[in-house]
């Protein structure tokens, strides 16, 4: 198998994948997207003879455009541009989950500060204001008072970028001090962990403590449905425990897994399982084009 790996920086996640691919004897072409040019009618030569391309772009904007180019070129890419589009934007993500009947936090979107403040007041305090594009828990705000709401909305309105004029307001979910991250391939869980913190944000990137987690049948069902809702692929599905059930608050398309790999230890070889799936996907693509 000849794999192309899109990157702008090789992180530990990519090193784990590269090591597993090379240990199996696969050819890997690393493609630094900062150096490439993408013509609307002809693919760059670096994509010739690749069986599959793995998108590991750090920047969401690059990921969205490059996967769209690869789809147009007919080059198999993980994940597809359709999946990337649905996962990269929290509004589209929430709409996809809701349409698929996946329990997800109640969310309202507004486009002016006045309308956003009305929505916040309707939710009551606390509620959550999130950027529509972003990761690692950045620029997320738990709003506890009207004064805080007015200040944060003013700051967002002043930031300038059009994405900050889309106010994504969500109910605050009382979770048991943790959430759950599941790495899945086409809806099948590979490994899962909890991320715990005394802070309301439990992201591993913000220092949340991780521990292996065993999924029950209900969680597995929701992971499968959430994956299908965005088109499948190599995904990170985030859930919160709500009473005896779960709510899915996000599906991630360029998922990091180094913290998960550490959390599960010897019980699951995460890069091994990912490459197993990648091999099967490349073989299926070859059969289709044969």
Predicted regions and their residues:
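Conserved N-proximal alpha/beta basic substrate-recognition cap immediately N-terminal to
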Residues: 2, 7-106
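Active-site nucleotide/adenylate-binding loops and adjacent lid/helix of ATP-dependent enzymes
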Residues: 3, 7, 71-74, 84-168, ...
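Short glycine-rich anion-binding loops that position phosphate/pyrophosphate groups of nucleotides
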Residues: 58-60, 133-134, 254
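Protein kinase-like catalytic core scaffold
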Residues: 127, 168, 183, 190-191, ...
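Phosphate-binding site of ATP-dependent enzymes
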Residues: 142-228
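A long amphipathic alpha-helix within ATP-dependent nucleotide-binding catalytic cores
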Residues: 201-246, 272-290
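Glycine-rich phosphate/pyrophosphate-binding beta-alpha loops
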Residues: 252-267
């Amino acid at each position: 198998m000849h794999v192309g790996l899109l990157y702008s920086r090789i992180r530990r996640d990519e090193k784990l994948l590269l090591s597993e691919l090379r240990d199996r004897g696969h050819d890997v072409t690393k493609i630094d997207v900062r150096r490439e040019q993408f013509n609307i009618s002809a693919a760059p030569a670096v994509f010739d003879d690749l069986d599959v391309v793995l998108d590991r772009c750090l920047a969401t904007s690059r990921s969205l455009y490059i996967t769209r180019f690869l789809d147009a070129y007919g080059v198999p890419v993980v994940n597809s541009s359709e999946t990337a589009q649905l996962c990269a934007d929290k509004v589209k993500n929430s709409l996809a989950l809701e349409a698929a009947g996946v329990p997800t936090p109640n969310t309202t979107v507004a486009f002016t500060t006045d309308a956003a403040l009305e929505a916040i007041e309707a939710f009551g305090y606390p509620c959550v204001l999130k950027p529509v594009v972003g990761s690692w828990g950045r620029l997320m705000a738990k709003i506890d008072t009207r004064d805080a709401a007015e200040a944060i909305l003013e700051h967002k309105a002043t930031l300038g970028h059009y994405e900050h004029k889309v106010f994504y307001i969500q109910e605050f979910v009382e979770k048991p001090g943790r959430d759950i991250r599941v790495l899945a391939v086409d809806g099948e869980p590979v490994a899962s962990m909890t991320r715990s913190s005394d802070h309301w944000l439990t992201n591993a990137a913000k220092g949340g403590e991780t521990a292996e987690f065993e999924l029950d049948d209900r969680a597995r069902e929701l992971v499968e449905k959430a994956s299908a809702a965005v088109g499948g692929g190599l995904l990170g599905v985030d859930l919160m425990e709500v009473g005896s059930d779960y709510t899915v608050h996000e599906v991630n398309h360029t998922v990091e897994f180094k913290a998960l790999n550490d959390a599960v230890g010897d019980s699951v070889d995460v890069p091994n399982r990912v490459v197993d799936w990648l091999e099967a996907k490349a073989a299926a693509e070859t059969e289709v084009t044969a």
